[in-house]
């Protein structure tokens, strides 16, 4: 319950003052993202700061699709240390650009983290009208060891217009 007395740190004009920054460390500086090339923006997807990654994804929505696809593939191929999460980020950026990349989708289906595989199943359902054989991808997902991946595959199969999807 809330105390009935007024706290001494109350601001008479704006109400309570809440601390929204961590004490003992400086504020993060907002990076200047405008004016960066597409390749530089894609590289910024590796940032540990969630706000920066979110702003980068918003800026990448306005980039030419061909340039975006080339930059994403160059980013994935340049670093041998690309992890599961980076593959997920790459596919999500290409999905927001409405660019179907079946090879990257298949690559995400093989990652260790079940969340990446579940996302790949969801994307396979969304792209079912544009993939060569979406049901083959969903069959892989239905046989996955994790229940969330199997569930996403079933939901994705419901998006398919193919009568074989019911099997």
Model regions and ranges:
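Beta-propeller domains with acidic blade repeats across secreted/periplasmic ectodomains
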Residues: 1-40, 61
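Repeat-solenoid scaffold signature
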Residues: 1-6, 136-167
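Amphipathic alpha-helical scaffolding segments comprising HEAT/armadillo-like alpha-solenoid repeats
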Residues: 33-42, 65-77, 98-110, 129-143, ...
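Long hydrophobic segments that form regular secondary structure
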Residues: 37-87
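Short inter-helical turns and helix N-cap capping residues of alpha-solenoid HEAT/ARM repeat scaffolds
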Residues: 48-49, 80-83, 112-113, 145-146, ...
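Residue-level detector of extended alpha-helical repeat arrays and alpha-solenoid scaffolds
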Residues: 52-53, 84-87, 117, 150, ...
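Conserved hydrophobic register position within alpha-solenoid helical repeats
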Residues: 55-57, 87-90, 120, 153
């Amino acid at each position: 319950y809330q105390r009935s007395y007024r706290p001494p740190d109350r601001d008479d004009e704006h109400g309570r003052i809440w601390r929204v920054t961590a004490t003992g460390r400086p504020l993060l500086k907002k990076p200047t993202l405008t004016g960066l090339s597409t390749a530089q923006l894609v590289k910024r997807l590796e940032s540990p700061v969630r706000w920066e990654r979110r702003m980068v994804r918003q800026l990448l929505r306005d980039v030419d699709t061909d340039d975006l696809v080339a930059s994403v593939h160059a980013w994935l191929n340049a670093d041998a240390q690309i992890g599961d999460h980076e593959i997920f980020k790459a596919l999500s950026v290409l999905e927001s650009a409405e660019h179907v990349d079946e090879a990257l989708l298949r690559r995400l289906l093989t990652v260790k983290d079940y969340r990446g595989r579940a996302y790949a199943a969801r994307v396979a359902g969304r792209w079912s009208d544009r993939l060569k054989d979406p049901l083959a991808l969903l069959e892989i997902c239905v046989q996955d060891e994790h229940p969330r991946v199997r569930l996403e595959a079933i939901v994705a199969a419901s998006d398919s217009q193919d009568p074989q999807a019911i099997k």
